[in-house]
Amino acid sequence: MEINWSWQRFNDISGEAMHEMLALRQEVFVVEQGCLYLDADGLDKQSWHLFGRTNDQQLVAYARLNFPNTRYPEPSFGRVLTSKAIRGMGAGRKIVAACIQKSLREYPNLDLQISAQAHLTEFYAEFGFTKVGDPYDDHGIEHISMIFRVPPNG
């Protein structure tokens, strides 16, 4: 299945695309994972949004890249998700790679910090992320902070 990727800032997202984004985030994080939290947390306005759509424009993958000094001093990405329809097809790897590339392009001298679900630390380590600190509970799911260090020469 071919997925077409595009980045948008909050103010450039149409009402329909915003609805699709929020619905898919709720489907994955609230319904599937049982995390009861305010998804529209105010960080969307200070973020780049990655949309992954099929050729028929169905939203099947998503992530957001928070601007520096929004969640952490460094840029960070989160809300990484794929719909059930495409899981196991490598889209998660493409999302993480796209987030790293976008961060390096927009913020070339800044490291990238994430709050990773603990069971995904090895997955993120494959991209160069290292654990920082101890695991912690985030809405009933164990997480750990991880950081991607930008090489000294960018």
Curated annotation (Swiss-Prot):
CDD domains: NAT_SF. Pfam families: Acetyltransf_10. GO terms for molecular function: acyltransferase activity, transferring groups other than amino-acyl groups. Residues 8-151 form the N-acetyltransferase domain. InterPro entries: Acyl_CoA_acyltransferase, GNAT_dom. Belongs to the UPF0039 (ElaA) family. This is UPF0039 protein sll0451. The lineage of its organism: Bacteria, Bacillati, Cyanobacteriota, Cyanophyceae, Synechococcales.
